[in-house]
């Protein structure tokens, strides 16, 4: 097998929909698919032809095992992967086990999608511990709830660009021309939040739209960093209305973030490994409870994905059932 709460009007972030999730200041490609993963926000975004189409909660690398920032590409996909345990973790375990087959004990969940150069050892994958998502707790991989991981894997195309970014704030205008600010904690201690640029962007927007914004409200949001979206201009009881537009605040601008013109990408066939292929990445060996083990069924490779270039062995079949929610642990071990 091949290895590979401060007195402000706030809006809680949605778990699985982009409808109420603050969006980052990014310039996605005008053509094709584009993935952005914002570490402080613990969210993954998919843009299609310059428009946001999906957003998911994710768990990312811990401060000691950080998810590599920068530009990557979506690589090979493996459904029902076998986890090939790295030598370092084999030594820690000391039980002679070298791999974990597909199933409820497999920390990769039902699917693994390579992220970037294989030498980085990174991937976007499911989990046997759904309670660990979102969070800052992986060995560097991007972890999704398994149903989300399956949807992601069948949506994204091999070769699509994927950027891991580090934005500690989101500044969005809603459909009612209200301005919303969210601030996030600094898990990697980057200390890269440019508050001067952020305040400049807010001030420029307020002037252009004839709004008054209380600077103390901004101060409170930036100090608390709750990760919730806070309205800077709303009357009491106002609700966020769609669609959202991100301001290009990282440059201190009041204009909207815009897609970056790119030529239409050359179609690339999805590269799908045979079911059960070994994947060697740093993951953690968490064993779910017996109920989860009894009800787990492997995932399938969707027949509707006509662009798949599958290396699936002849005669192999797949079935699908998500990992049950009752497998969530009370303590995350990775």
Regions found by a protein language model. Name each.
Residues 170-177:
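Short, Lys/Arg- and Gly-enriched loop/turn segments at beta-strand edges
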Residues 1-4:
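Positively charged n-region of N-terminal signal peptides that target proteins for export
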Residues 21-132, 151-154, 160, 179-279:
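Gly/Pro-biased beta-strand-loop elements
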Residues 274-334:
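Long, low-complexity, intrinsically disordered segments
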Residues 138-155:
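Short beta-strand-centered segments at strand-helix junctions
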Residues 7-16:
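Bacterial N-terminal signal peptides
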